[in-house]
Each structure stands twice: as structure tokens, then as C-alpha cells.
């Protein structure tokens, strides 16, 4: 198994070993009481009350296992899947008193009841009753009656989460509960079914990418088959890897869908640990798709111009809506993919080979980079300076653990004609646990001011400790550092609003411009107003 390897390597070869003896005893006794109470319920309440009671039980055991841990910042327990969607080992686990007034059952039950009441409120006034159907998503024509108006799906994201293996943690308890009698067909197997799960799994599958793409396409083709000509498909997507993008967009296009637009939705609280510690996922991307019948064959030279126009339109739309800079990327990607997915196939003019979605996204990055450089009137910057400005514009000044995904930044480098590994060797880019951290002047002890505008800027910021003459010597050697500094301040206004909200490094850039005799504007004035 894939996720199971994490705990098998620690000697946990049975699910009961995920609990200590005290936890096992408490859970088993509670389950016995639930079973007894369930048997005494009237027929009308037997099923619903048993179902919701077991949801409470599941919530409780999630926080009472040897993989639960104490979160010192919150002063409370964190559940088994709080760090990430995985069996994350904790050497020093925490546990709760399941019968305490403010913990265990008395904590889990009210939270489940609150969620139930919210669902009831949201469904109030709906003219039909929701129906829950268990089945293979690739058999929608069998599961559904009639033609749906829309399908909204949050599919598995490539290899991001191994749902079936994680579900086994709860399944083994539910199978031993009254639910196995209420829903016998659901609990026939010893563990959850693994075959046919639409994920990329390097352990179970010989060719994970091919199998994932094939199964995803089967599902999307089934969606296309049950939707009418005016039907809509909405796909939620959070994976940032290029393989996942490529698989999803190809599958959508091949199944007969066109991406109409893409919007970022920030769906999780900032304290959500598996999001906070995994900077690759900061929002859910909602892809709005419409059905299409066939499509023309396109040549990249023509499609590329269309991509450029749509990306610039999308960026302007995002700015009018007040979306932050990083969300401009997402909206622009949606526009670019909309162009691409409208064609049956896009071919390279020289080789005649098929152009893949990744190349389209790279073109979108290149168009956005040119637009930002033009907007801030820093066209004379070298490539490193342009990259530094764009990184700060889109991602700000994050910590190492909060930095963007390495692959995402690598593609931005390539779009500007830079070698990301070369920047890494220079110490400007730091690869940290799959993320790309952009070094500040304080991180870099020795720089050659003449190497680039970024090196010049960092050298000048360091030289401020020595006085004006030292700064002027650096500026004389690399005069375009002024241009980069102005661009960074202008981007700072776009991102942070005013100088008071600037991060430390950017505040130092403002000080540097002051030392050089430049008056930095207040508020959010544009660069052309500043320099005009």
C-alpha cells in the first residue's frame, strides 16, 4: 500500500495498534453502549440516530489515537489527519478523556449536531429531498435517473490523497458497529475497496500517471454522456503539479468539455494545519466547464496569439474584482486553458507534434510577466531583476515553510529564460522541502554587485550600514538597482496597501530609496505618477 507504508515501517501492522490499551478499552465500551442503545430505538429513528451517533464516534476516535498530538499553539489536541492528509507519525502523542465534560464524547457530539443543524438550514426551502447514492462514479448513467442540469465534483488530485487507505482508519470501526447491519452491502469487504480508485498510486499501479489519466477520462466521459448540450460541469482542483494539470486538462478536453473560466476560492481557515504546512495548496481552484461538440484543429502560432489576448483580458478582470496578485495567475490560467480546450488538438507549427497544456500555462506565465514589467515601467531590468520582482509581486515575502511550490517557481523562471537550478546554485533561490524560498539580502552574506540588479540591490541594502558613500559606490556599479527598487515598492503598494504593511526587507528598500534622495509616495500611487 501507499499510505500504509508510513505506519508499517513503525511496526503498526494492525489497525488496533494505532491505539493504546486505554483508548481501545474506552472506544470498545462506548461502541458496546451504542450498539445496545441502537437496538432499542423505534424504526423511525433507528437509522438516522445510529448514523449520526457513529459520526460522533468517528470524530472522537480521530482525536484519540497514538497519532493524535498536542498542538501547543492552540492548547488543544490535533487529530490524526491534522498535519496532512496522511498517516503522519507522532513520537509524542496526546489523548483525551472520552468521558470528560469538555472533551471526548461531550465535545464531539455538540459539534456534529451543530453541523447537522447548519445542513438543515441550508436545505430549508429546497423543493426536493437530497438523495445519497453509493456507486462507481464511472457508471453515472446507471446511478442517475434523468438528465442532470449540472455536475459538481471535487475529484482526487493525482497522488495527493490516498482516500481509500485513509478511510480504513474509520471503516474498521464502522464495520463493527450497528451500521454494518443497517447497510450490509457497504461493509461486505474487510477493508474499503482499492481497485478502481481514481488516484495515482505508485505502489498499486505499474504506470500511475497513465492509469489515473485513463480512469479520470472514463469518469469525465460519463459526465459528458449524462449531461445535455446545455449542461455544466464544475470541477474543484487544488493540486499544483504540472502532471496533475496536464492529466486533468487533457481528460476534460478529450471527454468533450471546454474550460470556460477558473476562479480561486479560499476554502480553508488559515490555521488548517495540512494547508498551512503545505504551501503548495492555498486555495481551491474552481474550473467552470461547458460541453462542446468536436472542435477545430489549431496551430500553435495562432492559438498562442489567442491565449495572449485572453490572458490579458482575464488579468484585467481579476484586477477590477480586486483579487490579489497570486489569484491573477489562477484566473489567467483558466483563460489560457479555455482557449486550449476549445480545440480538438493544438499542433506545433514546426514539429507537427501535439502541444500539451503545460506549454499553454507557460505561455500564460510569460504573458503575465511581460504585463507586470510593463505596468511598473521596469522594462530595462535584467532577467534576474524581473524574476525577483515577479516573485515578490505574486508571492510576497514568505517564510521558508510558507513559500510557493518549487515546480511553480521553476516554471516562472523558465518563462523568463532563467535556469532555476542556476539561481539555486547562486543562493538566490533556496529549495526547502519542495518549496522555493527567495533569499533576502540578510540571507546572502557575499554578493557581487555587478552580477545582476538583484545582487546590486542586496549589496546596496547591506552597504547602508556603512553610509551614503558605500551605497553610492554600489549604485554606480549597478545603476539599474534603482529600477528594481522602484518596481518592488510599487508592487508592495499593490500587495500590502501602504508602507505600514510592508515586510522588513521591503521597508529597507524604501529606506534605501530615501538614502538615494528619492521621495517614496504615500498611499497606492502608481509608478508613472511617482516618476512623472
Residue ranges and their predicted role:
Residues 45, 49, 222-229, 233, ...:
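Conserved, well-ordered alpha-helix/loop/beta-strand core segments that scaffold catalytic motifs
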Residues 27, 146-166, 223-226, 238, ...:
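Conserved proline-anchored active-site loop of SAM-dependent methyltransferases
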Residues 59, 234-241:
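Conserved short loop/turn motifs at secondary-structure junctions
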Residues 244-254:
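Conserved helicase motor "Helicase C" RecA-like lobe of SF1/SF2 P-loop NTPases
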Residues 202-212:
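The substrate-binding groove and active-site-proximal loops of carbohydrate-active enzymes
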Residues 1-147, 163-204, 219, 243-244, ...:
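Nucleic-acid modification enzymes, centered on SAM-dependent nucleic-acid methyltransferases
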Residues 213-229, 254:
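A short glycine-rich, Lys/Arg-flanked "PGG" loop and its adjoining helix->strand segment in the class I
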